[in-house]
From Swiss-Prot:
Organism of origin: Klebsiella aerogenes
Activity regulation description: Activation of apourease within the UreDFG-apoprotein complex is inhibited by zinc, copper and cobalt.
Name of the molecule in the record: Urease accessory protein UreG
Similarity field: Belongs to the SIMIBI class G3E GTPase family. UreG subfamily.
Annotated binding of GTP, by residue: 14-21
Localization (cell): Cytoplasm
Length: 205
């Protein structure tokens, strides 16, 4: 019987360049003094995101593990999540007292989802620079994720995107499911995401 604590597992997905790694860096730095954290990153042929988070000092290096999927990033979080499951278990056993493990997917598209065996909660990240039409395009990441992040609000004036239109479309596509705008450079929206994780993830309960 496993003697270590079973942490909350949070899948973080979204297209390449949407800000997944930046979000993880911000979340880790904001939460690490309160909760015991670790991160599993996914890249196809490298461990680039692991390196970025480590060099940014998001967490101690031994708390950040990179998985090289060697193929389609969707498969590693959905159909065959064995490498990620093994990394999560190894971290859980190594530290024994983890409260939360973030699992960052490789760059994916709007149809990618996490296996329920791998993630207890899912956060999906899109960004304003992709255009104001992105929320209404739908897809499981936008409509079914437990929490949707619309990042880079500071770029809206430069790409001609209306945050009001994006908010209206997001509300229509998601119904009661929570979401927020973020500008991670300024920390805008971060507290909303943390409150969601602590509440829905029942951290400390």
């Amino acid at each position: 019987m496993n003697s270590y604590k079973h942490p909350l597992r949070v899948g973080v997905g979204g297209p390449v360049g949407s800000g997944k790694t930046a979000l993880l860096e911000a979340l880790c730095k904001a939460m690490r003094d309160t909760w015991q954290l670790a991160v599993v990153t996914n890249d196809i042929y490298t461990k680039e995101d692991q390196r970025i988070l480590t060099e940014a000092g998001a967490l101690a290096p031994e708390r950040i593990v990179g998985v090289e999927t060697g193929g389609c990033p969707h498969t590693a979080i959905r159909e065959d999540a064995s490498m990620n499951l093994a990394a999560v278990e190894a971290l859980s056993e190594k530290f024994g007292n983890l409260d939360l493990i973030f699992v960052e997917s490789g760059g994916d598209n709007l149809s990618a989802t996490f296996s329920p065996e791998l993630a207890d909660l899912t956060i999906y990240v899109i960004d304003v620079a992709e255009g104001e039409k992105i929320p209404r395009k739908g897809g499981p990441g936008i409509t079914k994720s437990d929490f949707l992040v619309i990042n880079k609000t500071d770029l809206a004036p430069y790409v001609g995107a209306s945050l009001e239109v994006m908010a209206s479309d997001t509300q229509r596509m998601r119904g009661d499911r929570p979401w927020t705008f973020t500008n991670l450079k300024q920390g805008d929206g971060l507290s909303t995401i943390i409150a969601f994780l602590e509440d829905k993830g029942m951290l400390g309960k």
